[in-house]
Each structure stands twice: as C-alpha cells, then as structure tokens.
Amino acid sequence: MPVLHLKSIEDTTLWKQLKSGFTGDDANIAQTLASNLLGICEEAQDRMRAFPTLHPQYTLHDETHLLRVTELMAMVIPSDVLTGLNPIELTLLILSAHFHDQGMVLEKPELDALLNDPNFRIFRENWEIEHPNRRELRNRLSDKTLTEDARDNLRRIACELDAAMLTDFVRQTHAERSAEYVRARYGSDPRWNVAGVNIAELVARLCLSHFESAHKLRPENGFRFDECVGTYRINMVYAGLVLRLADIMDFDRDRTPDALYRTIDFTSRISLREWEKHRSVQGWVINRQLVQYTLRCEHPEYERAAREFMDWIDRELADAADIVRQFPAGFSKYRWELPLKSRPVPHRAEEQRLRLQRSGVYPFTG
C-alpha cells in the first residue's frame, strides 16, 4: 500500500479523533466506542482475509480497502467539519467503511448455492453473449495442438474472466447482503449499543445506500438529518455521501469497467491481475481546489479504465455538492468543499505528466 500506510484502525484519522478529540461526558462515550471498534474492525478485516471471495487468484476485497476507505473519509470531510462530528457520527463512518462490502464475501455454502441458482445460469449465458472473448477462449482451449504453456495461459485468462463474471453477478446484491450481515451478526451485540440503542440498523442502512443513487439519501428512505441516538443527533445523509465517495475514491475494485473485460483474449497483454496492481493509487491530492490522483498505468487500456473511474468520481462529486447545497439551514455546518468535477493540472504539472508518462506513471485528475 504505497500511499496510506495503515496497519490497523488505530492508524486512521477518524479513530484518533474518536479516541482523543472529546472532553467530559462525550469523552467517556467516545473512548468506549473507540475501544469497542478495535475488536469489531478486526473482525471485519479477518472476514475479508479468511474468505477469498470468488477465486483464489482474484480476491475482490481485502482489509486494505476497509482501512483506506476509512482514511479517505477523513480526507473528503473538511477538517473543521470532522472535528465537529459527534462520537456516534464518527463511529458510524468507521463501521460503514468496514462493513459496506461484506456482502461481496461468499462463504463456501453460499457459493455452492449460487452456482446452482437458475438466475445465475441465465446471467452467465447473457454475460458470455455480451463478452464473445470468453467463448473464443473456450474454443481455443479445445485446440489439441496447443502447447501446455499456452493452455495454462488460456486457463488463467479464462479464470480471470469467469471471476469477473461472477463478480458482476454478486455485485448486484452485495449492498443488501452487507446490510443483512450487519443486522444478523451485530443486531444484538452489546458493543454496538450507545445510550441503550443498538446502531447496527443505522450501519446497515448506510451499507445499503452506497450502491444506490445518492439522491435516495432522503428521509423517506430512512436517512434523516437529525436521526437521534440517545441525546446525539446524527446526519445520516452526510454520512451516506461520505461513505460512497470515499469508497469510489479507493478505485473500488468491484467497479472495474466492463470495457476492460472485453479487451481480454488469448492474444491480449491485458490482465485483471495486472489491472489490480495498476489500480493501486500512488498518490492523492484531495482538497477544496483539486482532487488529483497519480496511478501507474503501463498500458493504454489501464489508462482508459482509470479515466472511467474519474468520470464516476466526477458524477459523485457533483451529486454530493447538489445534495449538501439543499441541506436545511439548521445543518449548514455539514459542508462539502471538494471541487465539482475534474480540474486540469497546471502547466508545469502537465510538463511533469509528459515526463512521467515516459517512465510509465500517469497522474490523473478527477
């Protein structure tokens, strides 16, 4: 992990603020929550480590993603807004970062059941129609003149595409599965109780929201500006916006552009495993003037895929700004200061970009 050197939740800005950023009664509650989060977040990370999601060579999420999303949350929230969040809001953000993608984890019985699901068979057939390169690989594998090395390479590529297809299927319901997991696993866990209220339901709603339109973060869908937990008021709309943007800013790996899948065939130098490496961000600049990335892209297809991510981030930035702009007057402290869309790198940086391109590193702005 080249940029955010995070080994545990204790290294994140949000947890440090929860642990040490309060006084009086708030400090007592905050420190209890911070202590509870150590074990809870470790459980979330262990679950990601223990179950390679879809294929041992293509694990969809890992504990690194959870920690990075947690830290990116602190980067997208203005610093004075962050220090003004109450202990429950900080806790909800940390928990949602750690549980929003738990639905991508398939345990063995679930995977076996899914493979026999008629809906999955239909999905697979349609996916192969839309991705003729997969069918072409199958035909090539039937060639008896192939060398063993060539056959092994084709099998590897086929496995990558099969994992991508399965990922696409699971992705459709992973937010609901994440919410269900939180409710079932932690709905009666006393570590999740604050002032007599178990906050698993609030975390479940946030998990569910991150895969839906940002404009569904509305009171009628369970997202209020003044959700009450004991004497604390929680802005669930703001928490939902922060989660979804931090998630995609980690180049969330279940959002690999479909166009990249279509480029993979038996002659291609494109590999999903290689894309996984290149997807890793080498540097961020995130402030009110600029959201800028530096990624390592050694193939035009990886650059094209990365630029698609920039387009997604632009849409999320615009949606978030629009929603926050409509907050009631009493909630104006929850500001959003990130730029609305991509901005060009200044001229000197553009010259640097050309130099970096020659060495295989591409800065992107989004």
Q: Where in this protein do the model-derived segments appear?
A:
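C-terminal effector/catalytic modules and regulatory tails appended to multi-domain proteins
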Residues: 1-22, 26-41, 225-366
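Zn2+-dependent metallopeptidase catalytic core
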Residues: 64-79, 181-184, 188, 312-326
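Divalent metal-dependent catalytic cores for phosphoryl transfer on phosphate-bearing substrates
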Residues: 83-286
